[in-house]
Amino acid sequence: MRRVILTTGGTGGHIFPALAVAEEIRARYPECSVLFMGGLYGPEADLAARAGLDFVGLPVRGVLGRGVRAIGAAFGMAAGIARAYAVMGRFDPDIVLGFGGYAAFAGVLAARLRGRPAAIHEQNSVPGVTNRVLSRVVPRVFLSLPDTLGAFPPQKTCLAGNPVRASIVACGAERSDPRPDHVRRLLVMGGSLGARAINDAVVSSLPALAEAGVEVWHQTGAADWERIRKAYAETGHGEGRVEAFIDDVASAYAWADLVLCRAGATSVAELAVAGKPAVLVPYPFATHDHQTHNARWLVSRGAAVLLEQKDISMTDVPALLVGLLSDRARLNRMAVSARAQGRPDAAAAVVDGLVELLKTTPRAR
């Protein structure tokens, strides 16, 4: 491969698998140019820059469920497709891979209009609208979970797993010495954009967590960082580490005994590869409730506990968290179950699939 475009955007759940594949491509093909094509309004430009990738932004926004604003979004999509089409002509990619999200719709469709080979990757247990539509025009659909095998034409699908960054794969491969029984560490993450319901539940739990000697590393999201930081200071929880965004998530996973987080597909895949027990709080307004389906994949295998957001106010969250953190045997069983579901080779499997696709797919000039 000489030139590859990876296209997606919106949330880390789409973006981080693309970055994992970029890592794998650059490790195998150091001379290959990888271009990241994403939306102008999400975190993808910053994340691509941190990963050392060239970035092209498209003026696209979500259309689904936006009412009258969908008209403006449709114009943005048309402009995004036009820009992506122009970029395809200049960059001349060998292949284009989309990871869902509206930027991927523009990028992959433009690739097909240019006659370039293209494929898509679906992270969730319930396929997104973008990938359901694009599956009609691409020859290969990479899947993360067996639950989605029936959602796409079987002759196009490849069950590859959800690509996870190499640093997290390394974290899952390490076997650290057991911590002393009195050391309990809780990692709280609300996804790349944060989660107010999770933030509030943890703040309410701080007195009980402090009494139990629980250390907390809390990713709040940028919008909630100042408020939650002040709450930690007011409660006197000296063991709290509060950040808007965790750059080195592999170190955070390695540090943690238990993770409290949303159930985005990439979070679930990372938990499995890292072998981390979790309490999962699915985002209840996700399209087609896909986060609940993602969560149940780990919960049904004994690797996680499901806490629905609507039940938080009726749940003794401090007792749940302290109880799990105090039960080393259960945490160890959950960790083993999580690791058994992990696909540390997913990025390699996707790149293998791209190489094979290039061998069999004609390219228009």
UniProtKB/Swiss-Prot annotation:
One Gene Ontology biological process: lipid glycosylation
Annotated localization: Cell inner membrane
InterPro entries per the UniProt record, alphabetical: GlcNAc_MurG, Glyco_trans_28_C, GlycoTrans_28_N
Binding site for UDP-N-acetyl-alpha-D-glucosamine: 11-13, 124, 165, 192, 246, 291
Amino-acid biosynthesis is among the record's keywords: no
Pathway the protein acts in: Cell wall biogenesis; peptidoglycan biosynthesis
Record keywords, A-Z: Cell cycle, Cell division, Cell inner membrane, Cell membrane, Cell shape, Cell wall biogenesis/degradation, Glycosyltransferase, Membrane, Peptidoglycan synthesis, Transferase
Keyword Cell wall biogenesis/degradation: yes
Coiled-coil blocks: none
MF term (GO), any: UDP-N-acetyl-D-glucosamine:N-acetylmuramoyl-L-alanyl-D-glutamyl-meso-2,6-diaminopimelyl-D-alanyl-D-alanine-diphosphoundecaprenol 4-beta-N-acetylglucosaminlytransferase activity
SUPFAM superfamilies per the UniProt record, alphabetical: UDP-Glycosyltransferase/glycogen phosphorylase (SSF53756)
Stored NCBIfam families: murG
Name of the protein in question: UDP-N-acetylglucosamine--N-acetylmuramyl-(pentapeptide) pyrophosphoryl-undecaprenol N-acetylglucosamine transferase
Species of the source: Nitratidesulfovibrio vulgaris (strain DP4)
